[in-house]
UniProtKB/Swiss-Prot annotation:
<dbReference type="InterPro" id="IPR027417">
    <property type="entry name" value="P-loop_NTPase"/>
</dbReference>
<keyword id="KW-0963">Cytoplasm</keyword>
<dbReference type="InterPro" id="IPR020588">
    <property type="entry name" value="RecA_ATP-bd"/>
</dbReference>
<protein>
    <recommendedName>
        <fullName>Protein RecA</fullName>
    </recommendedName>
</protein>
<keyword id="KW-0234">DNA repair</keyword>
<dbReference type="GO" id="GO:0140664">
    <property type="term" value="F:ATP-dependent DNA damage sensor activity"/>
</dbReference>
<keyword id="KW-0547">Nucleotide-binding</keyword>
<dbReference type="GO" id="GO:0005524">
    <property type="term" value="F:ATP binding"/>
</dbReference>
<dbReference type="Pfam" id="PF21096">
    <property type="entry name" value="RecA_C"/>
</dbReference>
<dbReference type="GO" id="GO:0003684">
    <property type="term" value="F:damaged DNA binding"/>
</dbReference>
<dbReference type="InterPro" id="IPR003593">
    <property type="entry name" value="AAA+_ATPase"/>
</dbReference>
<dbReference type="GO" id="GO:0006281">
    <property type="term" value="P:DNA repair"/>
</dbReference>
<dbReference type="InterPro" id="IPR020584">
    <property type="entry name" value="DNA_recomb/repair_RecA_CS"/>
</dbReference>
<dbReference type="GO" id="GO:0005829">
    <property type="term" value="C:cytosol"/>
</dbReference>
<keyword id="KW-0233">DNA recombination</keyword>
<keyword id="KW-0238">DNA-binding</keyword>
<keyword id="KW-0742">SOS response</keyword>
Length: 363
């Protein structure tokens, strides 16, 4: 017995009824909650490119896929001690200030070095700083600043130092499990809407801890519970790779940053760059490394050259040349930014996601 084929018949009357029902629902919602509480995404002014602020590292800006860290989002930077977490956050503040932005630093660790911050380009006269006594006070100050709508970048350093009031007022050794996780969860529920509306970037610096008794997978975890992992649009894992030396004298660290989570571009890219002691991110070093990857800077043996002009023999000499010739460095940077897609592909070639990446970035 032959089966008759089913045919889908369009019903114009049904489409009209649906349209009327949707319009009635939209009108009811706007009467109840105000104009603009619901709209068609393509009709409003909300459809726009992601606004970003540079991290101070050209390579990391490329790896993030949108040219920097996104505004109006929660960002988490975590890693071991002395890996460059605060340095990266201060560079972001400096870049925002260059564009006329207002920035704040909630120093829960009470460890901000203003001399070092100034060396990184931070304008201390315009930087708002708070050194709160408790975690509740720190997050209340953060909430007030974000709701003001006047802050462009706010850094909380660090989540691990946000000590709940009950823990401070209690005795040393008292067991109070989950206090910090509950505090962070409640704070992020309140903050997330204000952050989006005010277009303020909030950077949480976090530390890592070791989970006891883990047999398989990474034993590392971040402090403050799981809420921050979910609310963060970008999570950066920064690690120190090696120590840079001039003869036998340490002059800086080579660090690797992995984009563990990214809601605005493809994740799992990683990049390496130098952080020099007392100077911060070595921008000229990045120009050479990324320029070679993109084919903009030519390398022949130990010699580096750009546009038929020799930059120097050896990486350090080439860095010195670019430091003394900022106009040439600017042209190389502009060429790299124009070829950002090509550079990102080169970065991605060396960044194959592992099972640990998916475990960390699934939130």
């Amino acid at each position: 017995m032959a089966q008759s084929s089913l045919r889908l018949v369009e019903n114009p009357t049904m489409d009209k009824d649906k349209s009327k029902a949707i319009d009635a629902a939209l009108a009811q919602i706007e009467r109840a909650f105000g104009k603009g509480s619901i709209m068609r995404l393509g009709k409003g002014d909300k459809v726009q490119e992601v606004e970003t602020i540079s991290t101070g590292s050209l390579g990391l800006d490329v790896a993030l896929g949108v040219g920097g860290l996104p505004r109006g989002r929660v960002i988490e930077i975590y890693g071991p001690e002395s890996s460059g977490k605060t340095t990266l956050a201060l560079h972001t503040i400096a870049e925002a200030q260059k564009k006329g932005g207002v920035c704040a630093f909630v120093d829960a660790e009470h460890a901000l070095d203003p001399v070092y911050a100034r060396k990184l380009g931070v304008n201390l006269d315009d930087l708002l700083i708070s050194q709160p006594d408790t975690g509740e006070q720190a997050l209340e100050i953060t909430d007030t600043l974000v709701r003001s709508g006047a802050i462009d970048v706010l850094v909380v350093d660090s989540v691990a130092a946000l000590t709940p009031r009950a823990e401070i007022e209690g005795e040393m050794g008292d067991q109070q499990p989950g206090l910090q996780a509950r505090l962070m969860s409640q704070a992020l529920r309140k903050l997330t809407g204000s952050i989006s509306r005010s277009n303020c970037m909030v950077i949480f610096i976090n530390q890592i801890r070791m989970k006891i008794g883990v047999m398989y997978g990474s034993p590392e975890t971040t402090t403050g519970g799981n809420a921050l992992k979910f609310y963060a649009s970008v999570r950066l894992d920064i690690r120190r790779v090696s120590t840079l030396k001039d003869r036998d004298e340490p002059i800086g660290n080579s660090v690797r940053v992995k984009v563990v989570k990214n809601k605005v571009a493809p994740p799992f890219k990683q990049v390496e760059f130098d952080i020099m002691f007392g100077e911060g991110v070595s921008k000229v070093g990045e120009l050479i490394d990324l320029g070679v990857k993109a084919g903009i800077v030519e390398k022949s043996g130990a010699w580096f050259s750009y546009d038929s002009q020799r930059l120097g023999q050896g990486r350090e000499n080439a860095k010195g040349f670019l430091r003394d010739n900022p106009d040439i460095a600017g042209r190389i940077e502009a060429a790299i930014r124009q070829n950002m897609g090509l550079v990102a592909d080169k970065i991605l070639e060396n960044a194959v996601p592992t099972a640990e990446d998916f475990d960390e970035g699934e939130a």
